[in-house]
Amino acid sequence: SMGRYSYSRAVKEKNEERFDSYLKVMAFLNENLGADVANEEVKSRSRFYAAVEDKLRFEKLAEKHADILFEEEKDCLERDHEKYMQFLQNLIKDPSGIASQTPEHLAFTIQFAGINESSSLAFSFRDLAANVARLSDNRELLNKAITWALEAITLFGNFTCYETLAEVLYKMGYQKEALWQMEKALDKMPAGNDAIAARIHGKLDKIKNNK
């Protein structure tokens, strides 16, 4: 979309004026969608400052960003469960949808039908924790990032959430614990993706060699 292009360009150029223009457009869209404009701006600023490696401004916003995510998390699992039950009822009413899918695709559809909101929030918590691990040396903030990575795992135990937890732990000097979590990421990683496997193995070697 135009918004994503504008944001990507602002990050690439580290251009605050372009980013402010993007915020104005998003404020208009978010208002029309009934979203909390102020909260959406905090999240956008946090992501932008992390992307352009503005450590100080990112650190100031990280906790506020997390608070917004925790607020958004309320009742999201219930809503996802309701959507999942509705999805199953629709399958029962019209089983022709099953016949047209391969078993693998059907399994994928069923798995993701019940985690729409929670998976999206999980990745938001994960990205926030990953940005803290990458940019910050603030011990208190890193401690909080452990909680955010764990929250991501609770919402949706994707392998990248374990990978992020390992990175936070490693940044804090917990080599053994980081190794355990990176090994979990390796176990949960989808089979057959050589690029992902190489990335995780590279991080495992880094932790083992304490580089």
Label every PLM stretch briefly.
Residues 1-211:
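Oxidative protein folding and maturation machinery
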